[in-house]
């Protein structure tokens, strides 16, 4: 449900900020799985922006390589989602 998704994101990103320094790869992987799931379910620009906001957080945590993999993966998987591709370009500028 949408409510449990919000809760899951809040928990994941809240705890990740404390753990990312000591366990970067584990945190990047958890975040990547969550972002992947969200992107698969996203249907409009508002939701694509949320996906990209999470990608930008990953970059802030030095997860550039993971963010780049996800951006490339989403571009290949969803070539017809023009609004998503548009939002992903904004993330790419920060990589």
Predicted region positions:
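Short, small-residue-biased leader/transition segments that mark boundaries at the very start
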Residues: 2-7
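Structured C-terminal portions of repeat-based eukaryotic scaffold domains
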Residues: 8-60
């Amino acid at each position: 449900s949408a409510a449990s998704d919000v809760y899951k994101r809040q928990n994941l990103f809240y705890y990740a900020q404390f753990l990312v320094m000591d366990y970067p790869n584990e945190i990047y992987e958890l975040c990547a799985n969550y972002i992947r799931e969200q992107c698969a379910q996203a249907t409009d620009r508002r939701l694509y922006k949320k996906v990209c906001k999470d990608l930008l957080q990953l970059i802030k945590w030095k997860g550039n390589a993971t963010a780049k993999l996800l951006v490339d993966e989403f571009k290949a998987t969803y070539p017809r989602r023009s609004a998503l591709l548009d939002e992903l370009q904004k993330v790419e500028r920060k990589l």
